[in-house]
Amino acid sequence: MLILQCVRPRSAPYAHMSGSLPVTLAESLFFNPINADFCLPHPTHRVDFPFEQYAKVLGHAPPADWKPPSDECRRRHHHRPPPPPPPPHGPPPPGYPPPPPPPPDDFEDDWFWDEEGGPPPPPPPPPPPPHGGPHGHYDPSCDPMKLSNLDEGLFDPLTTALKQNKPKIKNVLLVTLESTRKDMFPFKKGTHAYDTILSSYGSPDAAETLDKKLRNLTTTASFLTGESTRFEEDAAFNGTGHLGAWASEFAGAKGGINVQGAVTGSAYTLKSLITSLCGMEPLPVDFTDEVRAHMYQPCLPQILSMLNKAEQAKGKKEDGFLSWPWDTAHVQSVTDQFDSQYILDDQMGFRTFVTDDTLDDPASGHYPPKEPRNNYFGYPETETLPYMRDLFANAKRDNRRLFVSHMTSTTHHPFAVPAAWPGKETYMAKRRFAPEADEFESYLNTIKWQDGYLDSLLSMLHAEGALNETLVVMVGDHGLAFKASDDCKSNFENGHIANFGIPMLFLHPDLPRVQLDIADAATPTSIIPTVLDLLLQTDSLSDASSEVAKGLLPRYQGHSMIREQRWSVPVLNYSSSSASSSPYHDPYDFHHPHDAPNAIIDASFPTTNASANTHPFHFSIINPGGSLLAISQSHSPYRLVFPLCSTLPLRFTDLSSSPNEQTVAPLIAWSVDAMVKAVRARHGDDAAAWADLARRLGEWWFWEQRRRWGYHLPARSTDRGVVDGYAVGQIRKKHWWET
């Protein structure tokens, strides 16, 4: 029986079919989820936002005219009538079993007009779930978690730089750094990671030799962030690093905004892309089932398409690049066939793709690849540089603007650097029977390789004359825990803090260096608001495009990272009739692709200042998505790992006393009452109240995200049946006989 438990298949439906009966019965009797509702397509009871508890923990009553508790918002969330019936040939409802997904070329993007000038038919709505609206929908003015800083001023250095340097943003490059922990960007002496490496030698005398190797581990990252590595010879931080000519463009105090406290929205790469590229929080379900649901916000490529349509509607061209059309591309050196990424990329609005298939295509402009494949997903990122160079060169030649999403991959397991790379080092002391140390060392080498690659990437932009007119956004998709450094391994169903801290920075040679404090934590959902705000503040959009951007900016769940981190909350608008008074009109509903871009301009909402104790909560989905949720809050040291459809326990930590969650053992409990009691005994009443509120917020957020996405299938892939659970979390094969 033990052997069968080890070798039996894990994918649906075999995971259920091949379980040994005694073990399966024992699991059902003794290992049940703390809240089994999270395993179901719908809750068994109504789940409301804990308004009173939220106000009590914050220590103040909300404004009397705070909009989310109003009857208007309750009607919108719970009694919104369905849209007109669909045509009989329409696609199946979002969240319900669809036919096999079509190839990207057949995908019809319902955010925009079709080629004939009329809108494509709307998808049919699923039956209204018991707890809320009929399908995907988000209204920021009715979101009790919505905090806005758009009424705040820009950071002082930024205001001065905009007047003096007049930065120009013609292009945007968003680089997603695979599995890149914040403590590796840059790597610093004296950190827990450094101490882990040094301790492997058993003697502090090894520090001098070790420092010579480690001080150049993340030269580029140190220069870009403006954070010292704390080594005596900190060449990059002192401006004398061996970087490309591009570094001279960032003279003095220039560089951009470095968000030191960034937290991932998901420890699963493709869900993390949804937060950064679409400004949406992902679905708390296994794998990328967002492709079966309905995106409730336009992603960045779709926003840029809206700007193109606004320019077309205006007709009159403005001088310079402001009226040039935007092109979009997604570039990676690995496959896009894993877990439906090829569908997700297309649904996001990308129309140009570079993947490993491009590199393998004899008809490609830079075939054959110069390097062999270095992992089971594809090639090293350097193979994409010629293709990205072509994108920027062609955009410049054709008077077009460019948005490129680029994802690295070498830092992903199995942590293999190109065989011909000469920079490989030995960092950890060799110990017999210690494969976990070998794996961490391999990861460190991929971090060093990636750092050099970023230098090459910026050198390419500089050589093409695009660096001074390109906003470069760098963000990690998630962190990664290692047994050697964190006493736990991987990000799979693992709520350790090492899996969540990520780099996030906005770079431009004419922007000043702004360091956002670690306490001002943010998630990648703030990337789109920040990019739009920067385009507006630098006068990098035409009048027509600016109107669209201004209308879109307040809609998103994230915040602008170029403004003071003080908050306002939505309030009722007594001065004008609500646009939502018509039961079929909603200014925040993006499900009508035939709406003209100027139809969104009047959708802003009034706000009032929030209490000084009000700070954003952050919800981070843990790989694979439906089992655990990590909950944290800006300016709070507390973290709660909350089980969803999982037999795992609750886990509470206080980062003020245990920044790496190892100095003090986490509190573990198997019931909410036991957790609150344990937190109160160790950390006091305030911490206990926070933990209980975080648990209530997590429960509400779980079902609210399903309502927003219009998704009503089980959270775990093994519970979705043969059709819905097939091939999720796997690479799609080209032939049926491939296994």
Please report, for each region that a protein language model flagged, where it lies by residue:
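Short, flexible loop segments at boundaries between secondary-structure elements
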Residues: R432-E441
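Histidine-centered active-site microenvironments of extracellular/periplasmic hydrolases
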Residues: K188-H192, H462-P512, Y574-S575
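Active-site-proximal alpha/beta segments of enzymes that process anionic O-linked groups
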Residues: L4-R80, G95, P103-P119, P128-L174, ...
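Beta-strand elements within well-structured catalytic alpha/beta cores of enzymes
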Residues: P102, N165-F187, L304, R401-S409, ...
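Membrane-interface soluble catalytic domains
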Residues: L2-H16, H77-H78, P82-P84, P91, ...
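Histidine-centered active-site/metal-ligand motif
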Residues: T410-H413, H478, S485, T739
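Substrate-binding rim/cap in mid-to-C-terminal beta-strand-loop elements of soluble/periplasmic
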Residues: I257-L283, R431, K489-S546
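A structural signal for well-ordered alpha-helical segments within the folded catalytic domains
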Residues: K170, R215, T219, H294-Q302, ...
